[in-house]
């Protein structure tokens, strides 16, 4: 506590705060840091909650070094304010001590269905519930959280932290339906028939890309996000160890160099892999992963092969992977023994909802097309979309930023429709 207050006191309270400019959701960082420096933890949390529904998550997984902390003027000649650690401290302190309890708003403005409970879905639900909407989330998994629960390792984002943030949503009046797949159990039309005024698609990108090389479809080639999900289920006691795939002594290669690649590589080490090497077609300076994530991976024993590609994968007569062929930028090839290849090359939206709903247009890669006014509405009236299903895979906070804008669009749309209905009713 003392350390957090002292760190907050280093803030210069700039007239034009660059930290706020660097934050995708425009957090009022100097304001809550000032309250923290004065020991007013409750006031600080009130300010944070005005912009973020997931402070304990953002305090852990946001790329602070590229955003708020990277813009801090103190960082030009020394160490910038540790904004992420301060946000994490406040969110955890609030979670443990119950600093604030938000008042439930009367739910009088309409009903909104949210499909998916990842960062975008949770942000929509929190924002609209605070504005007086009845919000119900439809989640296909047995537990909500999406990528927060199943795609980020426990060592980076403990599952109990995610559960705590979701509990806050439920305390706002948000209802969550588990194990319910829209496009299978119900359609979008079914939801409208149930009386929802608007529907939000926050389903992310669950359809994996294929590895288009010889041997790219053999046993042992897996999606990195699939692997992370299996490990998460195993850690929660919902999956047998043998179903996680990577075992002690395995030799593993990871394709890609974003944060998901770092997560997969470090998790493979934790699961007992003998060796893990990340293969990336560009240089270290061009990787999308945070430098801090890369540094941690190196410390834990992950190897890196730069400016190279895996161009072939070989298997034995039983179809089990035996080796990979790696080609560098000069065209030189070498063969390495391998048991598994994890692909961290991104993914695309699943078509389950679009294929069962008339009027929702997508681009040639399956991403949902939306418009600016009202922000986030698809080509189907009353159906909105945001986050990765529209903008391609990105960070948690960027999905949140987009979702906050969509929440405004939904509120404007529902209010306008109800006003028009009221006028017609008076005629």
Enumerate the predicted regions with their spans.
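Ferredoxin-type iron-sulfur electron-transfer modules in oxidoreductases and energy-metabolism complexes
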Residues: 1-7, 28-60, 77-104, 231-232
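Iron-sulfur cluster-binding cysteine motifs and their immediate structural context
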Residues: 13-38, 57-90, 136, 143, ...
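Feature captures the FAD/FMN-dependent oxidoreductase FAD-binding
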Residues: 106, 111-115, 163-213, 312-321, ...
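N-terminal Rossmann-like FAD-binding beta1-loop-alpha1 element of flavoenzymes
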Residues: 111-136, 262-269
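Glycine-rich Rossmann-fold phosphate-binding loop(s) that bind the pyrophosphate
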Residues: 116-119, 257-258, 388
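Rossmann-like dinucleotide-binding cores of NAD(P)H-dependent redox enzymes
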Residues: 134-137, 141-172, 176, 265-312, ...
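FAD-site-proximal beta/loop scaffold in flavoenzymes
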Residues: 217-249, 337-393
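A conserved FAD-binding loop/helix module that cradles the flavin
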Residues: 264, 389-415, 420
């Amino acid at each position: 506590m003392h350390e957090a207050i002292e760190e907050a006191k280093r803030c210069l309270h700039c007239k034009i705060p660059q930290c706020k400019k660097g934050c995708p959701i425009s957090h009022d960082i100097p304001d809550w840091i000032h309250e923290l420096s004065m020991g007013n933890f409750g006031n600080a949390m009130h300010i944070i909650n005005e912009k973020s529904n997931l402070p304990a998550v953002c305090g852990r997984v946001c790329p602070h070094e590229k955003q708020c902390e990277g813009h801090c003027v103190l960082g030009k000649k020394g160490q910038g304010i540790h904004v992420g650690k301060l946000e994490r401290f406040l969110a955890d302190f609030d979670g443990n001590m119950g600093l604030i309890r938000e008042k439930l708003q009367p739910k009088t403005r309409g009903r909104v269905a949210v499909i998916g409970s990842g960062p975008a879905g949770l942000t929509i639900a929190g924002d609209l519930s605070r504005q007086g909407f009845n919000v119900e989330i439809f989640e296909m998994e047995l537990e909500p959280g999406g990528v927060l629960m199943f795609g980020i390792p426990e060592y980076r984002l403990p599952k109990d932290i995610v559960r705590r943030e979701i509990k806050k949503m439920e305390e706002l009046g948000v209802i969550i339906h588990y194990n319910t797949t829209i496009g299978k159990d119900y359609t979008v039309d079914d939801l409208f028939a149930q009386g929802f005024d608007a529907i939000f698609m926050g389903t992310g990108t669950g359809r994996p890309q294929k590895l288009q090389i010889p041997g790219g479809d053999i046993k042992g080639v897996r999606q990195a996000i699939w692997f992370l999900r299996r490990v998460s289920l195993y850690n929660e006691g919902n999956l047998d160890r043998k179903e996680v795939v990577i075992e002690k002594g395995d030799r593993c290669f990871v394709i890609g160099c974003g944060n998901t690649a770092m997560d997969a590589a470090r998790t493979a080490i934790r699961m007992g892999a003998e060796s893990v090497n990340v293969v990336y077609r560009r240089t270290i300076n061009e990787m999308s992963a945070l430098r801090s994530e890369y540094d941690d991976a190196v410390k834990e024993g992950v190897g890196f092969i730069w400016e190279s590609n895996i161009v072939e994968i070989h298997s034995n007569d039983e179809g089990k992977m035996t080796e990979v062929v790696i080609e560098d930028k000069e065209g030189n090839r070498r063969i390495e023994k391998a048991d598994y290849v994890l692909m961290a090359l991104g993914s695309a939206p699943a078509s389950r909802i679009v294929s069962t709903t008339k009027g929702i247009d997508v681009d040639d890669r399956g991403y949902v097309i939306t418009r600016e006014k009202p922000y986030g509405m698809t080509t189907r009236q009353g159906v909105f979309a945001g986050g990765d299903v529209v903008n391609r895979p990105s960070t948690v906070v960027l999905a949140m930023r987009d979702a906050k804008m969509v929440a405004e669009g939904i509120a404007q749309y529902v209010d306008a429709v109800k006003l028009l209905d009221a006028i017609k009713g008076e005629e």
